């Protein structure tokens, strides 16, 4: 009934109450505090958000809606009306519950985020404030005695008023424990899920002069639940005073912005990192054979200046680009606390030729390698010619062998023997040493008429050093003065005991000229090879040694190779010393081309990129890249060794050379036909010098004389020596134009004699003193315009005008000079002999007395010789 009356109430235009405009915002004044005690009153206002109250949670409204629906919908039965009413009520309740649940979840999420941010900011602000307060307290403690009382007094009311500040609004997390917790009205109990949310009052910062009834009026019978507010400390609450700093009141501290806190935190972190030593990282530093200081510093991640300081402490004065050895670098790395690992550039040679030992099942017999050694002109090459039925000795310049040759001979029984012929001249010691190193048996050729000679003894030493057996061939048995017994007896002095004297050394009396007992020599060699049981594996990569190397026009660099293991084929890639190449052709000792070379077979190999050195190892590798790496490493190693040899000496040595005078040098450019001759020439010429003059080899190589050789000789004013080679037309024309001397030779001792004569001509001549006579002073005369003249008697020898004289007084030399005048009876004479009187005067000297003795002598110039 009540609802019906409300709907039927008469309408009226008169308002029920007085119209008024409510305030949309609350205003107030706050005082802002700044640094240095400044403050300012500002006007602020807080606007309240307008929210429309939800009707979903009001039970009365729901009932009215249901009744209204029942009034207008008269076509439904009471049961249907009750069911619809229940459905509407349930839907409204579910919607309210869902909305409330979402709202609570959103509020809880925001509360957690705000709480976390607030706690973080408060913690940072508290820590920074404590640090600032402590610093300020320490600073203020020293000035407290000087601070006027009136400056400290105003701070007391401010500190005292701090506890009267209004308490902060409660957070969404619930009531905070405090003195006003019990005074909260009971209306703040949790609302039911169906209750509509009420807008909470906004927190308003009011002036201290505002009246308290204003706050009370805002509270109603049912005070609304306060809206959650972000609890953040105000950025500026007041300036820091001495009293507040000493009491440690946190409320008097002035807050800082988040950005300022972040910057301060980063600054403190950087300061702590600078003050605390950083944790050192231990690195593994790879150290090669040589390394410069900058590279070492980079690998350790250290400054180059620190590395140089460490080197200076170790006594090594080095620059940033100077190279140091591996041992010094390892000490530096250990000084910095890092770990070092030594590596070497020679690692590229690892595994080169170091194959596994060949099994006995793959080994086959091979011919013996025999080296013929002995003194010069004892018939080594003639003996080989007789066995090969050739005439090599007839083509040798000067009748001596100056090359090392390798040949293979087939005996009557069909067996093969490889012979290596070595020079016997003293200059070819290196060749003989190479021959003994690669050989299996040494045939020592001794002339029956000469016996044991110096190079024979040297050959015996090479054979003993190589630990190879010796077969003695006593040659020239066709001569009438041959004495083989003397040879056998002389061999005993060098620990070679032949079979005739109870030893185990085989010896054969032969004659190369008449081909006497050559078959017995072959039998002795084969017997010795059977005892040695020489075998090799032919089915593997080839290994050998360079016997000789040369440069031929149209063929390039050619080397004679003695194969020791494996089989060498055309197309193989190889490394020989510092050079590499690919086999283009193989030529045997008869000049025939072959496709393969088996063990103990000497062949000429074409295809070198450069000329190798005699005695270098010859090894076949798997590919071209490996060959290039090994070749580049060995060339770099040779260059470094050359730089070490030509490096400047110490400062003391330089001063010694300046004081003693630099030794005169004869620059020489040597070009020869084969590498062995180059070595022999260099060794022979370098032995010719002495302390006054010496040979300086500018360049020594294999091949013809070209323009670059002439240019090099011109730059040093040197001499060019061509041994069995000639200069090309362009080089000859350039040498003629520039005045460069080119000497051609084919015999090595002729080169030595000529160079020795040149060095002798560079020596300073020596002077020899020759005594010629004595004269005694009998009287002294004073002659006007002449001075004092001595009247003398020649007591011994003769006296010559212009000769050197010494004036002796009491057997002490008081003057040394020369005669200016020599007269006899007023006539100038050239000489006065013993027993005659004469008059003499000295050049620029007049202190002569009666009784003095004049010694007369001459200086003879003597040419110096080496």
UniProtKB/Swiss-Prot annotation:
It comes from Rhodospirillum rubrum (strain ATCC 11170 / ATH 1.1.1 / DSM 467 / LMG 4362 / NCIMB 8255 / S1). One of its GO terms (molecular function) is translation initiation factor activity. It is found in: Cytoplasm. SUPFAM superfamilies: Initiation factor IF2/eIF5b, domain 3, P-loop containing nucleoside triphosphate hydrolases, Translation proteins. GO terms for cellular component: cytosol. Residues 365-533 form the tr-type G domain. This is Translation initiation factor IF-2. It comes from the Bacteria. Residues 511-513 are annotated as: G5. GTP binds at residues 374-381, 421-425, 475-478.
């Amino acid at each position: 009934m009540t609802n019906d009356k409300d709907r039927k109430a008469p309408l009226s235009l008169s308002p029920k109450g007085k119209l008024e405009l409510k305030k949309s915002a609350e205003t107030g004044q706050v005082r802002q505090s700044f640094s240095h005690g400044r403050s300012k009153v500002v006007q602020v206002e807080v606007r309240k958000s307008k929210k429309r109250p939800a009707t979903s949670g009001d039970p009365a409204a729901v009932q009215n809606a249901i009744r209204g629906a029942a009034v207008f919908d008269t076509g439904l039965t009471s049961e249907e009306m009750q069911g619809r009413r229940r459905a509407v009520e349930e839907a409204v309740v579910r919607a309210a519950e869902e909305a409330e649940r979402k709202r609570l979840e959103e509020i809880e999420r925001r509360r957690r985020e705000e709480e976390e941010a607030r706690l973080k900011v408060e913690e940072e602000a508290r820590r920074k404030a404590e640090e600032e307060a402590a610093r300020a307290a320490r600073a203020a403690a020293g000035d407290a005695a000087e601070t006027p009382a009136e400056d400290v007094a105003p701070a007391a009311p401010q500190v005292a008023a701090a506890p009267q500040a209004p308490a902060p609004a409660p957070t969404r997390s619930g009531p905070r424990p405090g003195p006003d917790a019990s005074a909260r009205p009971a209306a703040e109990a949790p609302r039911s899920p169906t209750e509509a949310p009420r807008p909470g009052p906004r927190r308003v910062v009011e002036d201290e002069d505002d009246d308290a009834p204003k706050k009370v009026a805002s509270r109603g019978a049912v005070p609304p639940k306060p809206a959650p507010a972000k609890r953040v400390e105000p950025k500026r609450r007041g300036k820091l005073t001495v009293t507040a700093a000493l009491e440690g009141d946190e409320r008097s501290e002035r807050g800082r912005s988040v950005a300022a806190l972040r910057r301060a935190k980063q600054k403190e972190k950087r300061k702590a990192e600078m003050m605390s030593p950083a944790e050192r990282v231990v690195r593994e530093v790879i150290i090669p054979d040589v390394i410069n200081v900058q590279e070492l510093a980079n690998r350790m991640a250290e400054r180059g200046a620190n590395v140089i300081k460490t080197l200076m402490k170790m006594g090594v004065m080095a620059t940033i680009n100077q190279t140091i050895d591996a041992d010094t670098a390892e000490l530096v790395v250990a000084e910095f606390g890092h770990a070092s690992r030594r590596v070497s550039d020679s690692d590229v040679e690892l595994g080169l030729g170091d194959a596994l030992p060949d099994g006995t099942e793959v080994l086959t017999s091979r011919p013996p390698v025999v080296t013929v050694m002995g003194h010069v002109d004892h018939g080594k090459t003639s003996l080989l010619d007789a066995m090969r039925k050739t005439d090599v000795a007839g083509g040798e310049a000067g009748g001596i062998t100056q090359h090392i040759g390798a040949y293979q001979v087939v005996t009557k029984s069909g067996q093969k023997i490889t012979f290596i012929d070595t020079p016997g001249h003293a200059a070819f010691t290196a060749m003989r040493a190479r021959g003994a190193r690669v050989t299996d048996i040494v045939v020592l050729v001794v002339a029956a008429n000469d016996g044991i000679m110096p190079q024979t003894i040297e050959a015996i030493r090479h054979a003993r050093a190589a630990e190879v057996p010796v077969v003695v061939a006593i040659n020239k048995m066709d001569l009438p003065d041959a004495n083989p017994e003397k040879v056998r007896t002389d061999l005993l002095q060098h620990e070679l005991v032949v079979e005739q004297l109870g030893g185990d050394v085989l010896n054969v009396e032969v004659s190369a000229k008449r081909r006497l007992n050559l078959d017995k020599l072959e039998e002795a060699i084969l017997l010795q090879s059977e005892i040695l049981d020489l075998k090799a594996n032919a089915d593997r990569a080839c290994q050998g040694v360079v016997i000789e190397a040369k440069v031929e026009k149209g063929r390039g660099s050619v080397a004679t190779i003695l194969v020791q293991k494996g089989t060498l084929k055309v197309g193989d890639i190889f490394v020989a010393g510092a050079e590499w190449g690919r086999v283009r052709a193989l030529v045997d000792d008869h000049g025939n081309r072959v496709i393969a070379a088996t063990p103990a077979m000497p062949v000429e190999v074409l295809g070198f990129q450069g000329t190798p050195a005699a005695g270098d190892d010859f090894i076949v590798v798997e590919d071209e890249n490996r060959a290039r790496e090994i070749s580049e490493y060995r060339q770099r190693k040779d260059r470094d060794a050359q730089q070490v040899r030509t490096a400047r000496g110490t400062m003391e040595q330089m001063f010694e050379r300046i004081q003693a005078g630099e030794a005169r040098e004869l620059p020489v450019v040597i070009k020869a036909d084969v590498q062995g001759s180059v070595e022999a020439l260099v060794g022979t010429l370098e032995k010719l010098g002495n302390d006054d003059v010496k040979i300086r080899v500018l360049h020594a190589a294999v091949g013809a004389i070209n323009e670059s050789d002439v240019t090099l000789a011109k730059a040093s004013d040197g001499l060019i020596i061509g041994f069995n080679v000639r200069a090309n037309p362009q080089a000859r024309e350039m040498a003629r134009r520039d005045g460069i001397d080119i000497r051609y030779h084919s015999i090595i001792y002729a080169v030595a004699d000529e160079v020795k004569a040149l060095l002798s001509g560079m020596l300073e001549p020596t002077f020899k003193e020759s005594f010629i006579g004595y004269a005694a002073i009998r009287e002294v005369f004073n002659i006007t315009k002449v001075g004092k003249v001595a009247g003398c008697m020649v007591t011994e020898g003769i006296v010559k005008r212009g000769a050197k004289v010494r004036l002796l007084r009491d057997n002490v030399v008081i003057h040394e000079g020369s005669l200016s005048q020599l007269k006899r009876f007023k006539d100038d004479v050239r000489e006065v002999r013993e027993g005659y009187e004469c008059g003499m005067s000295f050049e620029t000297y007049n202190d002569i007395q009666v009784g003095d003795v004049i010694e007369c002598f001459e200086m003879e110039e003597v040419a110096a010789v080496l």
